[in-house]
Amino acid sequence: SCMKAAPMKEASIRGQGSLAYPGLRAQGNLETLGGPNDATRGLTSLADTFEHVIEELLDEQQVIQPSKENKDADLYSTRVMLSSQVPLEPPLLFLLEEYKNYLDAANMSMRVRRHSDPARRGELSVCDSTSEWVTAAEKKTAVDMSGATVTVLEKVPVPKGQLKQYFYETKCSLKGYAKEGCRGIDKRYWNSQCRTTQSYVRALTMDNKKRVGWRFIRIDTSC
């Protein structure tokens, strides 16, 4: 996020709900359609249906009240994965969030949005960011919803052994505009800075009394 003020002031973020995934099941195939024309109509229908499903996935949100004390970390997200090895792709929810943010910013019909890739128009982000999978061994500790520091457990026991906890973190890039302020802000009139903001994710942790449990902790999720 880009903080802008003259003089610089703090800004708060409203909490957003966590996303729920309804069950989906695809049926049929293009071979069951009645010819080339029907196949073309079928492809168009599938594309429209896919966009509709994405919007439904993102619109099904639970209302969660954020903590008043943590105004920069009041978003709820699902960027945690249990795996025996480093995940090769970003989490699905992250991709859906990025897609929805783009659709909201575009403010166009679904058909127009599909052909309006910002990369093709030469658009740039206000703040540059980097994203990567981080292990619990690298995080070691985190702050939970009560403000207490807890230990992030590296491994989670499962019936057939143990899996590692991975966190998909996004933070401001140390290169480029992050040091000079937000891109596109007139420096003659405004002071600005790119700042990493946090969200809550659910992870297996241990508190200072050695009690192990699933808690919401803060991780870096945007710039």
UniProtKB/Swiss-Prot annotation:
It is found in: Secreted. Its main location: secreted. The keyword Lyase does not apply. Residues 6-114 form a propeptide. Transmembrane segments: none annotated. InterPro entries: Brain-der_neurotrophic_factor, Cystine-knot_cytokine, Nerve_growth_factor-like, Nerve_growth_factor-rel, Nerve_growth_factor_CS. SUPFAM superfamilies: Cystine-knot cytokines (SSF57501). GO terms for cellular component: axon; dendrite; extracellular space; synaptic vesicle. PROSITE patterns: NGF_1, NGF_2. Keywords: Cleavage on pair of basic residues, Disulfide bond, Glycoprotein, Growth factor, Secreted, Signal. Glycans are attached at residue 107. This is Neurotrophic factor BDNF precursor form.
